[in-house]
């Protein structure tokens, strides 16, 4: 029978990774329970703003054929899950609460809208564990575990635009060693495969973007829209250690799914047309923007080009603000921007009148007190300020941080999951199944 499996919360801040678990689980099910993977695994990013998430807040969806009941499959998977979090990720020691969710494929089709709504809620909002358990009970979803149930159910509902990520995994003896990736080979990947792969190298800070920084099992991950070019990229990248195994995931990364539905509560995303009241460049380079609606927006120095553009905004400019709503001890509520689109630029500036005697510049003596010439000191009592057109070093359009988050869609990216993508996936899946059978991993 055909089933959908959701998996979450198998990593920790020290070791392990939910994607890593999903690959060795798929191999284990294939070799020991004749369970066939029917589609590429799905890497599902959820709410990026939740404070207690690990790294990328990702869950996994698998579609498999299993000769048994939903309960039997859940028992097999959760037993393997417990071994992984005890022996590999040490997740329980670090406050993780793994979970799984399973539903029959036929039932999934009839519950599609409900599951999709749960998925979107998992991206936009914070879902209580009790809500997830009641949802599972009401819709006959088999669950095991604890908090990871939330992300597992959300993963079941993933649908819509997707990209791919190819992830390579390290041998266990290398997990505590520094990753040594030849940077020139990563640049070569960019030269030969961009834009079908992307986010490979940061040319501003001169460092690769494909490597994580923790002790997790991942060597590197490459994002793209073509499996063929992801494989080519992997073949081009040079490292001082051998790859243990790799997988290609379908993923909602880089699709802007987090802006499909927005809100106005803490840890939700916001997309809002605002008019700028004033900006302030803070010590250190962060930009604080106040709006005519009394919203407070922050554009942090680390956002690079976005921060530079924000410094050039002024009163009267109109933008669409994209960002996350966060609590602030100082301001109560702030919006952290990851992108803005300039709709209207205020290209007018109020200027003091010229001196009628010598033509020199003047300075204000205070409200309704007139102006004083800076050169000849003549006092003007009746003149008013005038408007002057100014040149702005900005243009209408979208400005975005170069260090975009997992879900953020790059400006250049076109998403076209077409028949060519389908044929690529089928071809790769056949090869991937045989690799899964060869994989020898013992917990």
From Swiss-Prot:
Top-rank EC class of the record's enzyme: ligase
Subcellular location: Cytoplasm
Gene Ontology CC annotation, any one: cytoplasm
Keyword vocabulary terms for this entry: ATP-binding, Cytoplasm, Ligase, Nucleotide-binding, tRNA processing
Keyword Nucleotide-binding found: yes
Reaction(s) catalysed by this chain's protein: cytidine(34) in tRNA(Ile2) + agmatine + ATP + H2O = 2-agmatinylcytidine(34) in tRNA(Ile2) + AMP + 2 phosphate + 2 H(+)
Source species, domain of life: Archaea
Entries under Pfam families matching the protein: TiaS_FLD (PF08489), TiaS_TCKD (PF22641), Zn_ribbon_TiaS (PF23783)
Main location: cytoplasm
Annotated transmembrane regions: none
Keyword Glycoprotein carried by entry: no
A biological process term (GO) from this entry: tRNA wobble cytosine modification
Molecular function per GO: ATP binding; ligase activity, forming carbon-nitrogen bonds
Record-listed E.C. numbers: 6.3.4.22
Task of the protein: ATP-dependent agmatine transferase that catalyzes the formation of 2-agmatinylcytidine (agm2C) at the wobble position (C34) of tRNA(Ile2), converting the codon specificity from AUG to AUA.
HAMAP family in the cross-refs: tRNA_Ile2_agm2C_synt
Family stated for the protein in its record: Belongs to the TiaS family.
Protein name as catalogued: tRNA(Ile2) 2-agmatinylcytidine synthetase TiaS
Native source organism of the sequence: Saccharolobus islandicus (strain L.S.2.15 / Lassen #1) (Sulfolobus islandicus)
């Amino acid at each position: 029978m055909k089933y959908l499996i959701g998996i979450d919360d198998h990593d920790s801040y020290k070791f392990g990774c939910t994607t890593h678990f999903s690959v060795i689980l798929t191999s284990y099910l294939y070799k020991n329970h004749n369970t066939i993977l029917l589609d590429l695994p799905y890497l599902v990013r959820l709410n990026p703003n939740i404070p207690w998430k690990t790294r990328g807040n990702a869950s996994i969806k698998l579609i498999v054929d299993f000769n048994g009941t939903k309960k039997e499959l859940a028992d097999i998977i959760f037993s393997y899950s417990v071994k992984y979090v005890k022996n590999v990720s040490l997740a329980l020691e670090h406050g993780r609460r793994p979970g799984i969710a399973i539903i029959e494929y036929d039932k999934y089709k009839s519950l599609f809208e409900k599951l999709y709504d749960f998925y979107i809620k998992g991206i936009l909002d914070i879902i209580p564990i009790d809500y997830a358990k009641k949802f599972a009970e009401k819709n006959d979803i088999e669950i095991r575990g604890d908090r990871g149930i939330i992300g597992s159910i959300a993963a079941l509902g993933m649908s819509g635009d997707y990209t791919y990520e190819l992830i390579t995994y390290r041998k266990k003896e290398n997990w505590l060693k520094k990753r040594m990736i030849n940077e020139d080979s990563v640049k070569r990947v960019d030269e030969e495969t961009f834009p079908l792969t992307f986010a490979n190298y940061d040319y501003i800070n001169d460092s690769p973007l494909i490597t994580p920084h923790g002790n997790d099992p991942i060597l590197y991950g490459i994002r793209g829209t073509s499996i063929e070019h992801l494989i080519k990229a992997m073949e081009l990248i040079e490292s001082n250690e051998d790859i243990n195994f790799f997988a290609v995931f379908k993923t909602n990364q880089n699709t802007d799914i987090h802006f499909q539905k927005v809100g106005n509560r803490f840890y939700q995303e916001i997309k809002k047309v605002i008019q700028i009241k004033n900006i302030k460049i803070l010590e250190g380079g962060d930009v604080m923007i106040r709006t005519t609606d009394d919203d407070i927006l922050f554009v942090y120095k680390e956002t690079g080009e976005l921060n530079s553009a924000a410094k050039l905004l002024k009163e009267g400019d109109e933008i669409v603000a994209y960002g996350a709503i966060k609590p602030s001890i100082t301001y109560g509520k702030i919006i952290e921007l990851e992108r803005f689109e300039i709709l209207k630029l205020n290209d007018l500036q109020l200027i003091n009148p010229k001196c009628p005697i010598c033509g020199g510049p003047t300075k204000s003596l205070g409200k309704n007190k007139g102006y004083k010439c800076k050169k000849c000191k003549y006092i003007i009592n009746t003149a008013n300020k005038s408007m002057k057109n100014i040149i702005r070093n900005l243009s209408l359009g979208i400005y975005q941080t170069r260090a975009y988050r997992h879900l953020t869609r790059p400006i250049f990216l076109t998403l076209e999951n077409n028949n060519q993508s389908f044929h690529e996936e089928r071809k790769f899946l056949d090869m991937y199944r045989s690799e899964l059978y060869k994989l020898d991993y013992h917990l």
